[in-house]
């Protein structure tokens, strides 16, 4: 087992990354090794998918499936070895299908095949034992004995960035959004990584390519969400319990939430969002359901306590899932799509009757607590509609600084930095926030500036796209570059979606971003220095010192 993809991975003076029997996330060594074999086989699929395009061999089914399977290896998604093995076997079938078609097309054209990558040549062993024996050859740090650590680090930066982009591709695909050019570029990058590249410049260029690709993916995901559910509108959300039978929906999948709302109409069941599902309340086509009564709980790392205290059924639609046996609620938990935990019921299709039956069988919430309302729904349209008023306040000198504070949350004490920055921001500043990092401060009162709320909840992590649109509009209005705006970006990271968002910001030329609470363990000192030199990437430090630097525009 070698896994170094998330912020909580083991870091000691002598070693970096989870190894031995279990990762910090709870996945076993066997699951980790199986994920490595799956990713390796997916690189082989992409080799043939990319080459196939030369002969007009394009399979939409494979284009949709490949990033979905890749998503299953993201942190806190799937812990079931049988499911990972099944994905690997499907990848093998697709690889054989594509390679057979491509070789026939090349032969018909009288053309020789290019050199095959190791992943393209790989033949999946027939037995589980043989697959596990092969796993070290598919390890994410393969070749580390001979290669400079910077090359391994760059490979991982690209691999983990592309994994985050693949997750957003799947979210978009669920909503009917896909573009052939995006799929083609995904396969091209995945195939390149399957060649075990050693050119540092090529890898750096690829990391920026991934960032720009993800910008396009976030754009079509935004289109899918707004076309399906309407444009988010500023909406108040109750964060206190309401008496009654109940279902909690966590993850990121708005489609699943809609299906649950439709199937629970008239059944006396209240539906709550959790984690990254909080922004759902801002979408008109979801908020129209009166039994979507509020948000329960906070960020993913608190779920073992919060889910244990939730007296109803729980649906995990995507990341982030952690061990449900700790809080003894596995019998009330249901997984969807690429998510899985051993022994937990997994739901295929759109029939949530098992969830409904479970909810009705539970005690439900006994008492309604006094409401506590927070505001969400400052998506792209809402932000752009507010832009003229914001610009007027800037010109009048009433708004002097903007902060974008958000990203993935986690349980390290150092993450209090993000709370402290938000509450310490001067009253003539506006804070944009997104992703589950917002839970650090989104229940606090920030007031407003002449009717403009000082705290604007932009949405999920992928809604970075919306924040970028506002930033670009401000830069155009004030005839300056983004980096000349009175804007400070402070991002907390935990997993691969945050990595690709960071690559997107870098690829768009945005500099001076503060990141933390720690640097990714897969980045070497040399790579961190390179990111600092090229993008002015900054590590979070002392709140007072950092805030003074931000406000001074340095």
Swiss-Prot record:
Modified residues (Cysteine persulfide): 408
Subcellular location: Cytoplasm
Catalytic activity: A + NH4(+) + H2O = hydroxylamine + AH2 + H(+)
Matches recorded under SUPFAM superfamilies: Prismane protein-like
Residues binding hybrid [4Fe-2O-2S] cluster: 252, 276, 320, 408, 436, 461, 495, 497
Annotated [2Fe-2S] cluster binding sites: 3, 6, 18, 25
Protein name: Hydroxylamine reductase
């Amino acid at each position: 087992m070698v896994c170094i993809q998330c912020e909580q991975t083991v870091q000691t003076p002598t070693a970096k990354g989870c190894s031995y029997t279990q990762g910090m996330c709870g996945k076993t060594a066997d699951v980790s090794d199986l994920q490595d074999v799956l990713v390796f086989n997916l690189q082989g699929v992409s080799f043939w998918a990319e080459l196939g395009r030369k002969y007009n061999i394009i399979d939409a089914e494979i284009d949709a499936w490949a990033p979905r399977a890749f998503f299953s290896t993201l942190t806190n998604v799937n812990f079931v070895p049988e499911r990972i093995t099944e994905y690997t076997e499907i990848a093998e079938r697709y690889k054989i299908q594509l390679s057979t078609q491509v070789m026939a097309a090349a032969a018909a054209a009288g053309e020789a095949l290019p050199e095959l990558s190791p992943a393209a040549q790989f033949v999946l062993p027939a037995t589980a034992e043989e697959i596990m024996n092969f796993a070290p050859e598919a390890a994410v740090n393969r070749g580390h004995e001979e290669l400079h650590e910077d090359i391994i680090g760059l490979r991982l930066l690209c691999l983990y960035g592309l994994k985050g982009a693949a997750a957003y591709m799947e979210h978009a695909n669920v909503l009917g959004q896909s573009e052939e050019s995006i799929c083609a570029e995904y396969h091209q990058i995945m195939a390149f990584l399957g060649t075990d590249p050693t050119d540092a410049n090529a890898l750096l260029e690829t990391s920026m390519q991934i960032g720009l690709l993800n910008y396009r993916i976030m754009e079509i995901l935004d289109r899918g969400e707004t076309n399906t559910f309407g444009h988010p509108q500023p909406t108040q959300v109750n964060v206190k319990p309401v008496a009654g039978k109940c279902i909690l929906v966590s993850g990121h999948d708005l489609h699943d939430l809609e299906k649950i709302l439709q199937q629970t109409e008239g059944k006396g069941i209240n539906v709550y969002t959790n984690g990254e599902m909080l922004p759902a309340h801002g979408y008109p086509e979801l908020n129209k359901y009166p039994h979507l009564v509020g948000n329960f709980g906070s960020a993913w790392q608190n779920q073992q306590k919060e889910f244990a205290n939730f007296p109803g059924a729980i649906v995990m639609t995507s990341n982030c899932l952690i061990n449900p046996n700790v809080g003894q609620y596995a019998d009330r938990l249901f997984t969807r799509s690429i998510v899985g935990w051993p022994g937990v019921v997994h739901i295929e299709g759109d029939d949530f009757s098992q969830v409904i039956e479970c909810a009705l069988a539970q005690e439900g919430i006994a008492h309604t607590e006094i409401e506590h309302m927070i505001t969400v729904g400052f998506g792209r349209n809402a932000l752009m509609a507010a832009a003229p008023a914001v610009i007027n306040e800037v010109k009048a000198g009433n708004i002097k600084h903007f902060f974008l504070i958000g990203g993935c949350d986690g349980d390290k004490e150092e993450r209090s930095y993000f709370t402290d920055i938000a509450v310490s921001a001067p009253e003539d500043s506006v804070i944009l926030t997104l992703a589950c990092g917002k839970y650090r401060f989104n229940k606090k009162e920030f007031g407003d500036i002449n009717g403009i709320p000082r705290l604007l909840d932009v949405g999920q992590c992928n809604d970075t796209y919306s924040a970028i649109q506002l930033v670009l509009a401000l830069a155009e209005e004030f005839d300056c570059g983004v980096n000349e705006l009175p804007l400070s970006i402070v991002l907390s990271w935990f997993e691969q979606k945050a990595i690709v968002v960071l690559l997107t910001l870098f690829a768009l030329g945005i500099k001076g971003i503060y990141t933390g609470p720690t640097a990714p363990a897969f980045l070497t000192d040399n790579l961190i220095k390179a990111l600092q030199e090229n993008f002015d990437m900054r590590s979070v430090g002392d709140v007072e010192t950092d805030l003074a630097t931000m406000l001074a525009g340095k």
